[in-house]
Amino acid sequence: MARGKAKEEGSWKKFIWNSEKKEFLGRTGGSWFKILLFYVIFYGCLAGIFIGTIQVMLLTISEFKPTYQDRVAPPGLTQIPQIQKTEISFRPNDPKSYEEYVRNIVRFLEKYKDSAQKDEMIFEDCGNMPSEIKERGEFNNERGERKVCRFKLEWLGNCSGINDETYGYRDGKPCVLIKLNRVLGFKPKPPKNESLEAYPVMKYSPYVLPVQCTGKRDEDKDRIGNVEYFGLGGYPGFPLQYYPYYGKLLQPKYLQPLLAVQFTNLTMDTEIRIECKAYGENIGYSEKDRFQGRFDVKIEVKS
C-alpha cells in the first residue's frame, strides 16, 4: 500500500516537471512559447477589432450635440427654493422657520449677480424686452465658446433680494423662483394668443413662453389669493432670446432666464397646493413625471 502511494505521488510530480523530457505540465519550453504567442496574437487581434469599432463609432458622434434627440422629453419646470418634499411651511415672525428657504435662494442667485456677469468675452446684453430666438451658429467648435445673455436680478422685482433680503418670507408673502431645465438645442414655441383666452390674467408676447401658477384644487383656488409675476419686461414667462442652449462645452457660463412668483395674500394656517405650469406648442406633460412642464408645491403660512 505504501509502495502504491509513493508511486502515485511520483507520477504527479513527474507530470508537473519531467526532468527526462524537460517538460513542464506536459509541454516543452518551445511548446509553451508557441501557445502563449498564439494567445497573445489572438487577443491582440480581438482588442484591435474592439478599439477600431469604438473609434469608428466615435467618428459618428459629436461631443457638442447628440446625433438623435427624437426621444428627448420636453424640459422640466422646477422651483427655487429646491426642497425635498416640495413643501414650504414657515412662520413670518420666526426667522429660523424660513432661514433654509432664503439661504437656498441666495445660493442659487449667486451666479446672477452683476459681479458674476462682467466678462465681456462671455456675456452680452440681449435687451430689456423679450425678443426672438438667438441663433449662435452650428453645434461645433469652429467658432469657439458662444456668448451668453446676461440676466439682471432687478428684473425679479420684489423677489430679487435687492430691497428685501428675506424674499417676502418675513412678511408672509413668499417668493418662488421658476426655471425651465436645460435641454441642449431646445427652442421653445410659445402658444398662439387665442389659445390662452382661458387664462385672462396672462400677459401675452409672441416671444415669451408663458407660465402661470394657480390653485391645484378648487378649494386651493379660493385660498391662493393674489399672485404677482416678475420677469424680463414684466412678462410672466421665459424670453426666447435665451434659447437655444448650446451645452456646457460651448456655453459653460449659460444663465437660464428666471421667473419670480410672489404669493401676496395666502390664506393663513392652511396648506395650499399650487400648480405652476408652462404653456407652449412643444411643452408636454406627463403623469409619470410631475416636473415635466409643470410642478406642484405646497405652501403653508403659519400665524
Swiss-Prot record:
An individual GO BP term: sodium ion export across plasma membrane
Extracellular compartment segments: 63-303
Pfam hit, one: Na_K-ATPase
TM ranges: 35-62
Region (immunoglobulin-like) location: 191-303
UniProt GO molecular function: ATPase activator activity
PROSITE patterns with a match to the protein in the record: ATPASE_NA_K_BETA_1 (PS00390), ATPASE_NA_K_BETA_2 (PS00391)
Residues recorded as bearing Phosphotyrosine in the entry: 101
Keywords, alphabetical: Cell adhesion, Cell membrane, Disulfide bond, Glutathionylation, Glycoprotein, Immunity, Innate immunity, Ion transport, Membrane, Phosphoprotein, Potassium, Potassium transport, Signal-anchor, Sodium, Sodium transport, Sodium/potassium transport, Transmembrane, Transmembrane helix, Transport
Signal sequence segment: none
Keyword Secreted: no
Gene3D superfamilies: 1.20.5.170, Na, k-atpase alpha subunit
Subcellular location: Cell membrane; Apical cell membrane; Cell membrane, Sarcolemma
Glycosites: 158, 193, 265
Modified residues annotated as Phosphoserine in this record: 11
Disulfide topology: 126-149, 159-175, 213-276
Subunit structure comment from the entry: The sodium/potassium-transporting ATPase is composed of a catalytic alpha subunit, an auxiliary non-catalytic beta subunit and an additional regulatory subunit. Interacts with catalytic subunit ATP12A. Interacts with regulatory subunit FXYD1. Interacts with regulatory subunit FXYD3. Interacts with NKAIN1, NKAIN2 and NKAIN4. Interacts with MLC1. Part of a complex containing MLC1, TRPV4, AQP4 and HEPACAM. Interacts with KIRREL3. Interacts with OBSCN (via protein kinase domain 1). Interacts with TRAF3 and TRAF6.
Notes on the domains: The C-terminal lobe folds into an immunoglobulin-like domain and mediates cell adhesion properties.
PANTHER family: SODIUM/POTASSIUM-DEPENDENT ATPASE BETA SUBUNIT (PTHR11523), SODIUM_POTASSIUM-TRANSPORTING ATPASE SUBUNIT BETA-1 (PTHR11523:SF10)
Family: Belongs to the X(+)/potassium ATPases subunit beta family.
Protein name as catalogued: Sodium/potassium-transporting ATPase subunit beta-1
Lineage: Eukaryota, Metazoa, Chordata, Craniata, Vertebrata
